[in-house]
Structure formats: C-alpha cells, structure tokens
C-alpha cells in the first residue's frame, strides 16, 4: 500500500549502467534515464519460485546488490550487501501492472534523486530538496520500526546465516555519465 511503500526514481549512473549490463534499457529506464524503484518492508516480499535462477551483481565495492533472474536477465530488486537494515528496493519494471494499479498500490513517485533536473522541471518531477525531506519523513519512521522489530533479517535474498543465496559477482565498470 502507499502507506508502506516508498516510490522513488533514481537517475544515477550506476542504475543506468545496470540497465545496460542487463540489456534492458528500454524497460528499466524512463525518458530521463531514471529507474523506478519501490522500497518495501523486506518481510513483505516473498519469492515463490525461481530462486535457483537468481543472480546477483554489484558495481561498486560497497554498493547495492542488484538481484536479477539469470535466465532472462530480468531485474528484480536491490538490497544492501548484508541483511540487517530492513531495505529492499523492488524495480517497478519487474512487476506486470497497469498505471492505475501501480498508482493504487504504490502511490505517487515521492522523489526523483541523483540526477540533474532543470529548475523549471523540479516541481513537476518531484526533484526538489523539499521532496527529499518529505520522502524521508514518510519512510524513516517505517524503516526504523522495521529495524527495531528485526525485520531486516528476513530478506528473501539471504539465507538464515545472512549469506546471499547467490554469489554476488563484482562487475568492474564505470557509471553512465
């Protein structure tokens, strides 16, 4: 639900590089090169099948772990390197829905980050500094509540010992500029 979701668009060069590596630029990036991600409570995500096809890459030494289906190179989600903080960012392009259903399920995009947005477009694209603070005000209480309840240990991409269920591959590359 929109109350438990944080919907953002990231325009960083690493998200763009990831789309290129998966050969999914057309489906992963919007017209400005942004990747839409919705951040959710890790324990609310369940992988029903295909765990044996999961692959993981990371583009920087301490950066996000980027999970995808190795069989079709479909992006699934981003996590931190280790479980603990309750963070999973699901890539919106991996879900089959209509725009109406997406808006109902996730609410509006709360903020667009890591891009250069012309001042005239910042309000429309939700790329103002106040949008960042608003997003943090919405998400931070949930994040810390989930953390206090230990929900960061229930991330489906890690086993009970906290090890990734697929060995992360370090891809040495540069961000898209």
Model-predicted regions and their roles:
Residues 1-177:
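A short Gly-Trp-Pro
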């Amino acid at each position: 639900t929109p109350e438990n979701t944080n919907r953002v668009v990231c325009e960083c060069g690493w998200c763009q590089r990831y789309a290129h590596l998966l050969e999914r630029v057309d489906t992963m990036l919007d017209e400005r090169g942004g990747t839409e991600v919705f951040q959710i409570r890790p324990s609310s995500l369940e992988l029903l099948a295909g765990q044996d096809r999961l692959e993981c890459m990371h583009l920087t030494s301490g950066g996000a772990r980027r999970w995808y289906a190795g069989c079709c190179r479909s992006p699934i989600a981003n996590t931190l390197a280790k479980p603990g903080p309750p963070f999973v960012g699901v890539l919106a392009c991996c879900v089959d829905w209509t725009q109406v259903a997406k808006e109902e399920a996730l609410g509006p995009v709360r903020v667009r980050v890591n891009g250069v947005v012309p001042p005239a477009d910042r309000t429309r694209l939700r790329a103002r500094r106040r949008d960042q603070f608003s997003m943090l005000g919405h998400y931070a209480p949930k994040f810390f509540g989930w953390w206090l309840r230990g929900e960061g240990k229930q991330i489906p991409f890690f086993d009970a010992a906290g090890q990734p269920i697929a060995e992360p591959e370090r891809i040495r590359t540069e961000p898209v500029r």
